[in-house]
Amino acid sequence: MRAFWGALPTEGRWLLSTVAIQTLGRGLTLPFTLIYLHEVRGFDLGLSGTLMALIAVVGFLVTGPGGALTDRYGARAVLLTGTAAMIAGNVLLAFATTPALAAVALVLVGFNFGVSWPGFNALIASVVSGDLRQQYFGINFALVNLGIGVGGVVGGLFADVSRPDTFTTIFLADAASGLIPMALLLGPLRHVHGRAAAPADGSPAPAAVGYLTILREPAVRWLTLLTFIGTFIGYGQHEAGFPGFARQAAEVSTRTIGLAFAVNTAIIVVLQFAVLSRISGRRRTRVMLVMAATWAVAWALLGLAGLAPGGLAAATGVIAFMGVFALGETLLQPTVPAMSNDLASDHTRGRYNALTAAAFQGGAIAGPVVAGFLLQHDLSVVYIALMVLGCAAIALVALVLERHVSATVNGQQTEPAAVGEGTPS
């Protein structure tokens, strides 16, 4: 860790040192927004769920334009706009007494999600490169989980449905957490815009390179597909499929589910650094194979929990699922973003990251829909089988992807990683 920190440029240190604090605000509200809309503001459950879906839908719709704007105007400008929308959205949500006002607030929050992913990843990639970039994405992921995990615990202890003002407070705190990245972007990082004004090799200017052109690259298509499948069977199941199976098939308590999420966060935070040292210099596609196998084991454990519902074995299986799944997450997060940014050139980085983000959001939307349908029709065995088949599909796609990327893009470094200082405006 000391060597990594020493290799980072000043801009990278600024970005990384505040990640956990920034995401703590999101953790305060993420698990409780639906509860707030339904139990505090009195919106019926169906309407509350529809309002929540606005975040994902709007995020998906603006990801493409967000990537193009990142390449045209720079990651810094896009992130400032997205963060301002997030702050406004959370302030509105804190006082949203009508569905219309809540809808406007959640659209603003969704807009931020949609434009921030390609923007933030592009900003990181403008600061660090090579194996250092892969390490950065992994450590950033661990810190994000730490912030959200701690925020969730604090929010759970503080929020009380019988005291609406406690929910107002946590949404205002989430808004306030957005002031940290804004201060960084307007202060120490004001010269890092994350934009290449013109490609040095004479290739088409940013406006001439569209998404269809990028998708004609086989490596991009396969990486996008892998990201979609990985999200569909992974994060797309965290908020619906996993809790639904745990309650319906395994018949465990909500406390057990909460403990499982806590174990998931703890393992990511504790193991991410060790995992990064083990995968450094190894082919990223082979790391994805290990991830697929790890997730297959995790889903099998959850399936076994459903065979002995309501007891200690079921609770153990549910918690073990999230623990083993976390190990797979530590393999996924450093590899896919790093590979996407290594495929991109400086003037297309925003759009490459936008494609990855769109695939992620597509999987996050489709995952709960499919899980809800299968579990509603008591097809829990089919559900687990589909998840395991998804793991096999990831392995197959990773092997195909390997044939379409260079050794450098696949994480094999022949020289020490270079460190960029960012592009001055």
Model-derived features: where do they sit?
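Juxtamembrane intracellular "pre-TM" segments in multi-pass secondary transporters
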Residues: 1-11, 190-229, 415-424
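Helix-loop boundary and gating motifs at the non-cytosolic
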Residues: 6-56, 220-262
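Residue-level signature of mid-helix packing/kink "hotspots" within the transmembrane helices
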Residues: 56-64, 149, 265-273, 364-365
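Helix-to-loop junctions at the C-terminal end of transmembrane segments
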Residues: 62-74, 159, 270-285, 375
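Structural signature of the two symmetry-related core transmembrane helices
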Residues: 77-92, 286-301
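Cytoplasmic helix-loop-helix junction between adjacent transmembrane helices
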Residues: 105-146
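C-terminal membrane-cytosol helix-exit motif in multi-pass small-molecule transporters
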Residues: 156, 176-197, 396-402
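A membrane-interface helix-boundary motif in multi-pass transporters
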Residues: 160-176, 373-392
